[in-house]
A protein has these predicted regions:
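N-terminal leader/linker segments that initiate helical-solenoid repeat arrays
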Residues: 22-63, 68, 72, 82-91
Length: 202
């Protein structure tokens, strides 16, 4: 063998090892994402959103552009129940720190909903679950104390899906908390009417 042939042989061997290594890595990643998906779906099926959070975070590390799983992550943050709630008998500093952690969680949920619900609406404007995602986004804004924005999102949710009649109930509650009694009364009536229409339809 001349030097050129030996060099080419070595180069091909190195390339084959490199390609095999990449292929093995890709296969391992695929196996992990499949296992994570199964775990996430299983937990959400039994309303264990909080337990799904670490699996969702790992899944999104591996697949950063997965729109649906970003929405599931936002939902899990909205529903999470493992954060310590401030108690009246605790020191003020502890209560403040706990409140900040809770607020940070809801702020992240609302940020994720905003980015991904709007993207979903852009790429799949007729998605049957779009109204439901707007509904959850509205709650995250409510819990982030963005009440006016929450009202607009609840209105959008029920416009997209008329079955989300509780949107009217939530809007009425929000208007009451803002001291806008006339608007609250209007939406209480809308809620009652929408509920009655749903019952008649069933």
């Amino acid at each position: 063998m001349d030097k050129t042939t030996i060099y080419i042989f070595k180069l091909v061997s190195v390339c084959l090892v490199f390609v095999t290594s990449i292929s093995a890595g890709g296969s391992k990643k695929k196996e992990e994402t499949i296992a994570l998906k199964k775990q996430i779906y299983g937990l959400h099926k039994v309303d264990e959103e909080t337990s799904s959070i670490p699996y969702l975070e790992r899944y999104l590390e591996l697949s950063q552009n997965e729109l649906y799983f970003k929405l599931l992550y936002a939902k899990a943050l909205l529903y999470r129940n493992d954060l310590s709630v401030p108690k009246p008998d605790e020191p003020a500093e502890d209560r403040i720190n706990k409140a900040k952690i809770i607020q940070k969680n809801y702020n992240l949920a609302s940020k994720l909903f905003q980015e991904n619900v709007l993207h979903l609406e852009k790429v799949r404007p007729r998605d049957p679950n779009l109204g439901r995602w707007y509904y959850l986004w509205a709650f995250s804004e409510w819990f982030s104390d963005n009440k006016e924005k929450s009202i607009k999102l609840f209105l959008k949710a029920v416009k997209l899906d008329y079955r989300l009649t509780e949107s009217y109930y939530n809007i009425a509650s929000l208007y009451e908390s803002l001291g806008q009694w006339k608007d609250a009364s209007l939406y209480w009536r809308k809620f009652e009417k929408a509920e009655k229409e749903l019952e008649e339809e069933d």
